[in-house]
Amino acid sequence: MKIKDALIKAYSVLKETNDEFYMEDSQILLSYVLKKDRIFLITNREYEIEENSLKQYFDYINMRKKKMPIRYITEKCEFMGLDFHVEKGVLIPRPDTEILVEAVLEYIELNNYKKVCDVCTGSGAIGLSIAKYAKDVEVLCSDISPDAIRVSKINRQGLNLEDRVKIENGDLLEKPIERGEKFDIVVSNPPYIREDEIPKLMDDVKDYEPIIALVGGEDGLDFYRRITSMSKKVLKPGGLIAYEIGSDEANEVSNILENEGFVSIETRKDFARMDRVVLAVRGGL
């Protein structure tokens, strides 16, 4: 089968599922199978696809038909201009999370911060991106999920950051607290979706992405309360705490931080002009 015919067939399959990106998804998956870029598909529409590659392609199309996210099928995701390995068991990094990373990098440059802890690291996208772009910074990436630890270690190796990034399995900040370790920054994209919102999520999210990385308790704020309280034991005075938040959680998260003695609380918006990041500084001496 030629490229043009394979794409037409794939378009038809995915269009039936109301996938608004059916053409893009079909092209991404064929590019992945053929190990060619999408320009090749456009300029070589008469190219004959080998039988084994064709079978693999339509296996992937059927996975996408069942709403499996493209990033889980290809096990690849771009974040902050870097390539990350992702798979089922870890959350797929979102473009909006880049705003959190950029805010942290800004504070590092302004304050010469040297030590960062990324809590609920998942694939390691946040902590590893910070380490990649802030050359003098040491980062600890922590997660309770063994899958997250394994995947983040793959990404650490892929980005050649073994010398400055430590990855450990643990519950939030418990292990750093036990060691008496101190940080200039605690950053986290914790689970923040309310329990009653889970059934309303898109199928590709609720059916495939790990629930442990999504649910933030009855009101979505459980992890903000815990991390904020624990961070006072590891953050240096004047240190930064940086959160990704749900678009309706800015006031509640800001109140949690204020009640725990944090100051200079700031909210930043995402690409859709929705509240997405809250930053605060630990007060005291």
From Swiss-Prot:
Belongs to the protein N5-glutamine methyltransferase family. PrmC subfamily. It is an enzyme of class 2 (transferase). Keywords: Methyltransferase, S-adenosyl-L-methionine, Transferase. The keyword Transferase applies. S-adenosyl-L-methionine binds at residues 143, 189. GO terms for biological process: methylation. The keyword S-adenosyl-L-methionine applies. The gene is prmC. Methylates the class 1 translation termination release factors RF1/PrfA and RF2/PrfB on the glutamine residue of the universally conserved GGQ motif. It catalyses: L-glutaminyl-[peptide chain release factor] + S-adenosyl-L-methionine = N(5)-methyl-L-glutaminyl-[peptide chain release factor] + S-adenosyl-L-homocysteine + H(+). GO terms for molecular function: nucleic acid binding; protein-(glutamine-N5) methyltransferase activity; protein-glutamine N-methyltransferase activity. It comes from Clostridium acetobutylicum (strain ATCC 824 / DSM 792 / JCM 1419 / IAM 19013 / LMG 5710 / NBRC 13948 / NRRL B-527 / VKM B-1787 / 2291 / W). It comes from the Bacteria. Substrate binds at residues 189-192. The lineage of its organism: Bacteria, Bacillati, Bacillota, Clostridia, Eubacteriales. PANTHER family: HEMK METHYLTRANSFERASE, MTRF1L RELEASE FACTOR GLUTAMINE METHYLTRANSFERASE. This is Release factor glutamine methyltransferase. Its EC number is 2.1.1.297.
